[in-house]
Amino acid sequence: MEPRAPRRRHTHQRGYLLTRDPHLNKDLAFTLEERQQLNIHGLLPPCIISQELQVLRIIKNFERLNSDFDRYLLLMDLQDRNEKLFYSVLMSDVEKFMPIVYTPTVGLACQQYSLAFRKPRGLFISIHDKGHIASVLNAWPEDVVKAIVVTDGERILGLGDLGCNGMGIPVGKLALYTACGGVNPQQCLPITLDVGTENEELLKDPLYIGLRHRRVRGPEYDAFLDEFMEAASSKYGMNCLIQFEDFANRNAFRLLNKYRNKYCTFNDDIQGTASVAVAGLLAALRITKNKLSDQTVLFQGAGEAALGIAHLVVMAMEKEGLSKENARKKIWLVDSKGLIVKGRASLTEEKEVFAHEHEEMKNLEAIVQKIKPTALIGVAAIGGAFTEQILKDMAAFNERPIIFALSNPTSKAECSAEQCYKVTKGRAIFASGSPFDPVTLPDGRTLFPGQGNNSYVFPGVALGVVACGLRHIDDKVFLTTAEVISQQVSDKHLQEGRLYPPLNTIRGVSLKIAVKIVQDAYKEKMATVYPEPQNKEEFVSSQMYSTNYDQILPDCYPWPAEVQKIQTKVNQ
């Protein structure tokens, strides 16, 4: 994309306070004219440097730190100080910085969030604000909000209930909305709904920043969520995107089903994970040379991620011509009690859909040997669940077994890339949820494991939805997104073991996703932004956030010389 000219931005701020506004601050990149006219001359050292040099300075500071948690704090402090520079740093090397601002480091940051909290980066709305949520929203300084990421902190990554400390997730997620998708950060709002926590360690921690009582559940919880959705949509408009993040299984599906046709909303753990997993499967099919409807897919896990993927796989198989009933027969799920089969006790409605006539089995190794899947997908956050025997069996059943260890963070991965490639002698088609280093095999080949990161999905979806004012987001959007992502994977990438485009191309991938969403939205009469733009790519691209510093001096321009004459005498 061509670099844009600096945007002119009006501000009444002057002096010291301007240097404390992260939206306006340029640090040492302020020109001499700006320093003098904005009354900040003398507050900064006399050196004037470019943003490129500023990025280099941050990277050098970043690299001298010894822990990822300290690197996370460095970047968050930068975000609080100079927003443009923060995003310029992230975009300079997305592959390097994404694991710090999001998975896996954000998991550690959430565990330590009571220590990491510096200043407000979003809104904390507690159950005790019920009846006054509209007033709490008024505390946020921005009047125009187009995207909200909200969590109640009950199921943070694979770490469980972190309560109020889960705020690190919406903050990190929205940072990627901008870095990877170009959504304007000033139009993004992270929100944590604090209804308490079941985490005993947090309840006893004197430094914990959230409510110190058990989670509120039932009708009171539902009424609280209803009020929040109504208040947010009322204040920011029905087109405001509200993304649900890291809600527990008991709430995730029912809240999605409850709100999806009433508000502009989606659940990334269900739909985003599904989209990126299906994108990986579609890319893998170019290696196996067969169709998705030819696969037998076994899931280790039957929570929101597994069920979300399963439903989208069914939709993709239907698109290939298979009936929904026959597509479901090709999908098997394993939860904490074993294989999901008909007649098994205490199956939820969501799990019942994928229950088949089969004997009950509990051991995953035995289940793999019995089902003989062509694709094995782990989303249960059980580290090491894919044992050496399971990997050997997958390689015995299949010439090119598809093995996805998608659980986060790294410690929860079902197997490592090295284990998978070594045991299967490089025949496995592997993807993971967290990043793994390249693996060199005994035969000299080096394979680059694909990272099935949701950040391939949600930034582009958000950009497209916001750009055209899509009122509701159905599952078709996520199948379309999966197809677009898989199309960006070249044959060379596949030969290297990659099932996803390189992360350093993610902004371009997000643009393609957004353009496709916008095209479909106008074609299906679902867009609300009019008049319809003729060139959809130009339209979307023009709305993407630029890290170029804004021009904040007043607009100065000349008048004709004759009208500038100074009158010195009173006309007689």
Swiss-Prot record:
Residues at which a divalent metal cation binds: E245, D246, D269
Primary location: cytoplasm
Q: Which SUPFAM superfamilies match?
A: Aminoacid dehydrogenase-like, N-terminal domain, NAD(P)-binding Rossmann-fold domains
An example of a Pfam family matching this protein is malic
List where in the cell it is found.
Answer: Cytoplasm
Q: Where is this site: Important for activity?
A: D269
Copy out the cofactor comment: Divalent metal cations. Prefers magnesium or manganese.
Has UniProt tagged this entry with the keyword Glycoprotein?
A: no
Family membership? Belongs to the malic enzymes family.
- Record's function text: Catalyzes the oxidative decarboxylation of (S)-malate in the presence of NADP(+) and divalent metal ions, and decarboxylation of oxaloacetate.
Name this protein carries in UniProt = NADP-dependent malic enzyme
From the broadest rank down, the organism's phylogenetic lineage runs: Eukaryota, Metazoa, Chordata, Craniata, Vertebrata
